[in-house]
Amino acid sequence: MGYSLQTHARHEKGIMTVGVGGNGKSVLDSVVKGMVGHDNFAAVQPNNLDNNFQKATMRLKLVNAITESEQSSKLPSGHVKAIISGEAMTVENKRKDPFVMHPFCTLWWATNHLPHANDYSEAIYRRMFIVEFNNTVPPEKRDTKLAEKLVEQEMPGIIKMALDAYAEAVRSGFAIADLHNIAWVIVIAKKAPF
């Protein structure tokens, strides 16, 4: 989460949270949005990542929050890699001249299902931290105000923990997460529609 507070893309990392509903993905999404503030996130969905007008909304944003993808949706690998890496891209606002931007927003992708990808190379998976949300909270045990409480009451502590974790990730070279993602490459490749 601390990487999402940085105004650079030098680590080339995005986050994909995966799991069936009722497990906290939307709480985390709300906390991330609360952490960066309403004016500092975009919400360009996967099917619009090739749209130059939509991509322009990511200019100077810390986070691009993708809230769901269809089970049969394809991961737009080239666009995802370019955004996560902060590559130069020409975008435009309506009725304005095109301009070049280097996005630095962290892609936060919350999904019930892993999207299919045409690119099963290391390049895409080296860029995505894939976090499993395996525990479904029974409806009677859910705190429907949890996200609101965390954002309103716990944000200073959350930001401190996020920045401390980011500093540790930088020191370790993000090594642990990279090993975790190797296992996901195998899982995703086995599910690939070849």
PLM region descriptions:
Residues 2-194:
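Feature primarily recognizes SF3-like P-loop helicase cores of small DNA viruses
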